[in-house]
Amino acid sequence: MNNLCFNRFTLRTDDAKTRRKILRWLALNSRLYEYLPSEAEIRGRFISRKPFPAEALRRQIGKLRGDRTLFLRIVSTDLYSLYVEGNVYLLGAWHRIFL
């Protein structure tokens, strides 16, 4: 598929190493074009191919199971096909929402 998926993310964790690993994965596997860090969380935007590679990200997060403070929310949209998907990682479990 050649359609691009525009994604917004919110990342919260107390572990700086986990934060770096997730941001590095996003930078290497997509086009990270907005990064807004604050004390409590990091928000940003990136572009990926549609559909969003959720399984690859789930495998990466699966390696970080020890971090119970990790919260990651990604909302993916494709304005051409009206595709909307949400992926949320909270308390060690993934939740996926389609609209």
Model-derived features with residue positions:
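Short, extreme N-terminal segment that most often corresponds to the first beta-strand
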Residues: 1-28
